[in-house]
Each structure stands twice: as structure tokens, then as C-alpha cells.
Amino acid sequence: MIRLVLLFVILPLTSYSDKHIPYYKSLAHDESWLRHYPENQDLNKQTEKFLLTEENMPVKVIEEFRNSWSSYTDWYRIELFNGIQGWIAHNQLSKKRTLLILEDIELYALKSYDPESWMTIQKGIILAPKIVNLLEVKETMVKISIPKGNKSSVKGWIPIDYRLWGVSDKEMQTLND
């Protein structure tokens, strides 16, 4: 009886996640291997699927894998913007939130826009493809920053639509509830 109780107490701890899947992270390095399955000791490199070469590229986490002896998630099953899926080691991902601009999009100075209003100030056009930093999510727009170099950046608002990849439906539902 005691073993059964311990089993129910211990098992949830090994599969617990503080995030609701799916959620987004970004690549931490400019070279990361996407694998067929979560295996680090592959001497013949048979699990390697693709070499991802874009640091800060947003990825969607769709599954977590934790070894029974580990206190943290060891591997993440991710999906890329084009639908490709695979496994990546925990140290290859960052909590930094980024977005991928899939098509050219307008950058606005304010968090609302109306083509008929004099209050709408267009700061420019972001040419795709482009990775940008996600700063804030509002109902229909996101605040972003675009690195310019020399530690400076351009900040502004862009509408949330099909031209973006990296904002989840759950984030939008949370804002609208």
C-alpha cells in the first residue's frame, strides 16, 4: 500500500511541466542539431536530422522528455515554422522570445492602427524573412525590437496575422479572456 502511494506521489513529479504545451522558445546558438529522437550518445551520428544555423530563430515546443533521474527537461520535441519536427537538447534552446516575419510587414509607432486615422504613424516596412525580438503581446498587435547593431534597436508595433510565426493561440486567448 505504501509503495502504491509513493508511486502516485513520485510519478507526477517526473512528468511535471510548468509550461502548457505548446509554447515557444528560440535557438540559443548559431549551430544546433535537430535529431530524429532524443539521443546524445550517438557516435555514428545517425540521429542527426538537420543542422539549424539561425541563432534566435523561434521554435514551437510540442513535447518534453525528461530522464527519470533528471530534475529538468533534457530534450524538447520542436516544430519549425515550415512544419519540420525533431528533437533538440535543452542546452540548445533559450527562453528569449522572438518572432519570425514570414512576409513583409508594416512597423507602427503606436499599438493600434487605423489607415484612416492621423494617429497612425508608420515607421517603416520590415522586409521578410526577419527574426525580431518579442517584447509585448496585446490583443491584435505585438511590440517588437529589431537589432540595428552597436546595441541599438528600432522598436515598434506590428499586427498579429499570417505574416508572423511565434505567437501561440493560448497567448492570444489569455489576453482576450
List the predicted regions and their residue ranges.
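Boundary regions of SH3-family modules and the immediately adjacent low-complexity/disordered segments
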Residues: 18-26, 41, 60, 69-116, ...
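Start-of-domain marker
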Residues: 28-30
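Short polybasic amphipathic segments
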Residues: 32-36, 107-110
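Conserved beta-strand/loop element in small beta-rich adapter and peptidoglycan-binding domains
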Residues: 44-69, 117-138
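Sec-dependent N-terminal signal peptides
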Residues: 2-13
